[in-house]
């Protein structure tokens, strides 16, 4: 009997000590956990701050100052497009319509096109003088649009239409085209293009260089030979500065002939040299036609050529007068209609 109380006291003491020890261990583990958590929280905050900074910088690269999405800047197109095919066999469908051509060129709008895959090296305006040649125009547009697109050009096509039945003035129409096209875009290069000539080889680049370019080396109607050694007609390319330097074309060539030789003389007067592509590249098909009424041969062209050196400063872009009747933007081209009411 005397031994029982000490036994029970010792057992309870053991339980108390065991319970105290357990509390101590749990407390120690818990305190270590919270200390570690406190140390981790600042690191987590630093990580999230860095993450948000990266996201913000990424957004700055794709958003403009006004919050609008910015497209990444395109690389320049190559000087020679990888899309070129070379010589093509041209086919002219007798029942071809403008609507068919529009369907084949869905990325052309208001006569304008630019490549989406790269930044074009030049902005090129194609100027086509026109009157009563609707079928020729359709055929040219059918082939010219894909031709220029394969060259990866930023281009616009302008048809300059002379109204009325008075004598046709190709050169003055081209001066008008130059002046009016520059109201819409600061074009780098101008291609002066007859409506009845269709290029056959897309390596014949419709771009401008250090010197004026004559692109028609040969055509089917001449056996693909140059018409004469100093021929500078049909299709020519001059930069904005080159054409301005020579004061453009003369305005005084009414009817057919002489204006292209006059331009050549102006180019030579300014010590510029005419360049041409290789004969197998500068090939064109001329669509057959008879002489238009109102475009008879200019019998006074030789006299005008003789006085070019005296009058070029006052006869050209600087004196090109006309009445602008309309500027209409069709899907495939811009149509500029003018009246030369002072025509003789």
Curated annotation (Swiss-Prot):
UniProt: UDP-alpha-D-galactose binding residues: 129-133, 168-170, 195-196, 224, 256, 289-291
Enzyme Commission number, as recorded: 2.4.1.-, 2.4.1.275, 2.4.1.90
Disulfide linkage: 77-118, 189-208
Keyword Electron transport belongs to the record: no
CDD domains named among the record's database cross-references: b4GalT (cd00899)
Alphabetical GO biological process terms: carbohydrate metabolic process; keratan sulfate proteoglycan biosynthetic process; lactosylceramide biosynthetic process; protein glycosylation
Catalytic reaction annotation: N-acetyl-D-glucosamine + UDP-alpha-D-galactose = beta-D-galactosyl-(1->4)-N-acetyl-D-glucosamine + UDP + H(+); a beta-D-GlcNAc-(1->3)-beta-D-Gal-(1->4)-beta-D-Glc-(1<->1)-Cer(d18:1(4E)) + UDP-alpha-D-galactose = a neolactoside nLc4Cer(d18:1(4E)) + UDP + H(+); 3-O-{beta-D-galactosyl-(1->3)-[6-O-sulfo-N-acetyl-beta-D-glucosaminyl-(1->6)]-N-acetyl-alpha-D-galactosaminyl}-L-seryl-[protein] + UDP-alpha-D-galactose = 3-O-{beta-D-galactosyl-(1->3)-[beta-D-galactosyl-(1->4)-6-O-sulfo-N-acetyl-beta-D-glucosaminyl-(1->6)]-N-acetyl-alpha-D-galactosaminyl}-L-seryl-[protein] + UDP + H(+); 3-O-{beta-D-galactosyl-(1->3)-[6-O-sulfo-N-acetyl-beta-D-glucosaminyl-(1->6)]-N-acetyl-alpha-D-galactosaminyl}-L-threonyl-[protein] + UDP-alpha-D-galactose = 3-O-{beta-D-galactosyl-(1->3)-[beta-D-galactosyl-(1->4)-6-O-sulfo-N-acetyl-beta-D-glucosaminyl-(1->6)]-N-acetyl-alpha-D-galactosaminyl}-L-threonyl-[protein] + UDP + H(+)
Necessary cofactors: Mn(2+)
Keyword Protein biosynthesis: no
Pfam families noted in UniProt: Glyco_transf_7C (PF02709), Glyco_transf_7N (PF13733)
Membrane-traversing stretches: 13-38
Binding-site residues, N-acetyl-D-glucosamine: 258-261, 301
Residue ranges, Lumenal side: 39-344
Pathway participation: Protein modification; protein glycosylation; Glycolipid biosynthesis
Membrane topology of this protein: Single-pass type II membrane protein
This protein's UniProt keywords: Disulfide bond, Glycoprotein, Glycosyltransferase, Golgi apparatus, Lipid metabolism, Manganese, Membrane, Metal-binding, Secreted, Signal-anchor, Transferase, Transmembrane, Transmembrane helix
Family note: Belongs to the glycosyltransferase 7 family.
PANTHER family: BETA-1,4-GALACTOSYLTRANSFERASE (PTHR19300), BETA-1,4-GALACTOSYLTRANSFERASE 4 (PTHR19300:SF9)
Full protein name: Beta-1,4-galactosyltransferase 4
Organism: Mus musculus (Mouse)
């Amino acid at each position: 009997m005397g031994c029982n109380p000490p036994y029970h006291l010792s057992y309870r003491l053991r339980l108390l000590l065991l319970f105290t020890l357990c509390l101590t261990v749990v407390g120690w583990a818990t305190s270590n956990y919270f200390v570690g958590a406190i140390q981790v929280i600042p690191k987590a905050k630093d990580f999230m701050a860095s993450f948000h900074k990266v996201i913000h910088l990424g957004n700055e690269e794709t958003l403009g100052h006004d919050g609008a999405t910015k497209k990444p800047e395109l690389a320049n197109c190559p000087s020679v497009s990888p899309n070129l095919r070379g010589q093509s066999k041209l086919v002219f469908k007798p029942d071809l319509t403008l609507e068919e051509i529009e369907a084949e060129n869905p990325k052309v709008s208001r006569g304008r096109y630019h490549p989406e895959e790269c930044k074009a090296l030049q902005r090129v305006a194609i100027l086509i003088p026109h009157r009563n040649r609707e079928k020729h125009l359709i055929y040219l547009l059918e082939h010219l649009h894909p031709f220029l697109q394969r060259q990866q050009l930023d281009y616009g096509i302008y048809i300059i239409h002379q109204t009325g039945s008075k004598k046709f003035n190709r050169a003055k129409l081209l001066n008008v085209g130059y002046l009016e096209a520059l109201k819409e875009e600061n074009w780098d290069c101008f291609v002066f293009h007859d409506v009845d000539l269709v290029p056959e080889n897309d390596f014949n680049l419709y771009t401008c260089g250090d010197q004026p370019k004559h692109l028609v080396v040969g055509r089917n109607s001449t056996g693909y030979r140059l018409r004469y050694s100093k021929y500078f007609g049909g299709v020519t390319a001059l930069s904005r500065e080159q054409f301005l330097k020579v004061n453009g074309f003369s305005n005084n060539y009414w009817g057919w002939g002489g204006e292209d030789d006059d331009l050549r003389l102006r180019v030579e007067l300014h010590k510029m040299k005419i360049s041409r592509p290789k004969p197998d590249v500068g090939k064109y098909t001329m669509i057959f036609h008879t002489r238009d009424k109102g475009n008879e041969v200019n019998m006074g062209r030789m006299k005008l050529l003789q006085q070019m050196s005296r009058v070029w400063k006052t006869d050209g872009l600087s004196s090109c007068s006309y009445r602008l009747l309309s500027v209409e933007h069709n899907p495939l081209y811009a149509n500029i209609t003018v009246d030369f009411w002072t025509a003789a």
